[in-house]
Design a protein with these regions (language model features):
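Basic, flexible Lys/Arg- and Gly-enriched helix-loop patches that mediate nucleic-acid binding at interfaces
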Residues: 1-242
């Protein structure tokens, strides 16, 4: 069955969908000896697909990993600035896995990694609206801060859906919230705090869809169970089946 090349490369764990598109544009991908262009399709079972002259990798077993990411790690597999990356934290899993979505360097908590490109792309697609829940520590809190934080704002030209906000603790101008969002805009929760007149000092993701961080130690990872993978495929907080 023919599929778009970037989807094939992603499904084989050779690159993320975006990176695969970059490789195709750079002329690094060929099909049956002919340099591919973006939009080309191929059959991975019958066509000779190569990346930088190397044949397409044999299909790997699907691996799904939950990492409790510490602060100070970038959510990439390598970093041109030499900063610590999450790849080093999961190197002993024995498979090349890719982060599902982003968690910025200054944030911590639940991060999914997998070599199942189709699963990752579906989970990240905006139409599924997978809910993500964070514990958020702020300074600059004033009474009513939770109501300001819960107001919809416009980020990057897009009006986000009103988040769910619960005040967990407040002492003077310091507070802790639990915030659930539906999108995944760049540094979204931190920018929401700024818009509400508060400064986010710590951010920890504790849940994505039906998957919870639980008591997994910081910097450690574990495999998802079959039930957890199935729960993400059909999870509360999505607009249908992934």
């Amino acid at each position: 069955m023919t599929e778009r090349l970037q989807k094939i490369l992603s499904a084989r764990g050779m690159a993320s969908r975006r990176k695969a598109e970059e490789l195709i544009r750079a002329g690094q991908v060929s099909v049956n000896g002919v340099t591919a262009t973006l939009g080309d399709c191929a059959d991975p079972e019958t066509d000779d697909i190569r990346v930088a002259g190397q044949p397409l990798a044999v299909r790997e077993k699907n691996v799904y990993i939950l990492l409790n990411k510490p602060r100070g790690y970038v959510t990439t597999l390598s970093d041109e600035k030499g900063r610590p990356d999450v790849a080093g934290l999961v190197a002993d899993c024995g498979e090349r896995v890719y982060p599902v979505g982003r968690l910025d360097m200054d944030s911590e908590g639940l991060l999914l990694l997998t070599n199942d490109g189709a699963f990752a792309n579906a989970l990240m697609h905006p139409k599924h609206e997978v809910e993500k829940t964070y514990d958020v520590w702020v300074t600059g809190y004033m009474p009513g801060g939770e109501r300001r934080l819960a107001k919809p704002i416009t980020l990057d030209g897009y009006t986000i859906r009103p988040p769910k906000v619960k005040l967990l603790k407040a002492e003077g101008q310091s507070a802790k919230f639990r915030v659930t969002i539906h999108e995944g805009r760049n540094r979204q929760v931190r920018r929401m705090c700024d818009a509400a007149g508060m400064h986010c000092t710590r951010l920890r993701r504790i849940q994505e869809g039906s998957l919870r961080l639980g008591d997994l130690p910081l910097g450690k990872w574990r495999y998802l169970t079959e039930a957890e993978v199935a729960g993400l495929v059909q999870t509360p907080g999505t607009s249908g089946t992934i």
